[in-house]
């Protein structure tokens, strides 16, 4: 099985399996999207005539030495991870996005966004939390360090932009393939040159050990879904030093927000320690997750 944590530190040679000859134009569109956004992905496309049932997908996950993307018979692009096809699947969040508000979404209670807010989701992942943030009318910049994930996000944004009910929300999302620290440094330099754009909220959902959802005393806790399992293949949890650098850099960005109070919101499993061992200004939690707010 491919060690993605090593592969994704350089240009990625990625196998794309598609199941119908008529999808050749979509393969070309994917190549163009990769070039447009300068993603370090080398896409090796292959037409597959055999049926990719669950057993065959599991076999491919075990024997193939590079990441696999699958363009299925419904023209949906997914990543084959441990035999499971995973994709952002934003359309499945429609009911949640439509009804999102501070009463139903703990994240929005913590972020306290308005329609004119500027937000950075510095660890976008599959983009589900970005949708909730953007449902308020806020502009959300989504940072995703892993090129493979960034490609899935860009494809999903294009797909959802064809649906009338989603077009306004999609227009409020900007997806960038970069790591948070590099972007924060560039942004602070941008502000330092006299530019006035300011960020109201930075949202962080860093990787954490797979057992972090469990209470260390009882062993009980929330189950980890397939999307989270897939993300654990892409990234290591940050070290304490890396956590400190990430939190400090985020705080530096939101501190340049004029007279308004900026805030950094950090998502943690309910039983996980605070990011960088720094006590938050305030926390919001339920039985599974906790949102720690750092006010600047």
Curated annotation (Swiss-Prot):
Its EC number(s): 2.1.1.242
Enzyme class: transferase
Residues that hold S-adenosyl-L-methionine according to the record: 205
A Pfam entry, by short name: SAM_MT
Domain of life of the native organism: Bacteria
GO molecular function, one term: rRNA (guanine-N2-)-methyltransferase activity
Gene Ontology CC: cytoplasm
Entry's localization field: Cytoplasm
Alphabetized InterPro entries for the sequence: 16SrRNA_methylTrfase_J (IPR007536), SAM-dependent_MTases_sf (IPR029063)
Chief localization: cytoplasm
Alphabetically ordered keywords of this record: Cytoplasm, Methyltransferase, rRNA processing, S-adenosyl-L-methionine, Transferase
Catalysis performed (reactions): guanosine(1516) in 16S rRNA + S-adenosyl-L-methionine = N(2)-methylguanosine(1516) in 16S rRNA + S-adenosyl-L-homocysteine + H(+)
Purpose: Specifically methylates the guanosine in position 1516 of 16S rRNA.
Family of the protein in this entry: Belongs to the methyltransferase superfamily. RsmJ family.
Protein name, UniProt field: Ribosomal RNA small subunit methyltransferase J
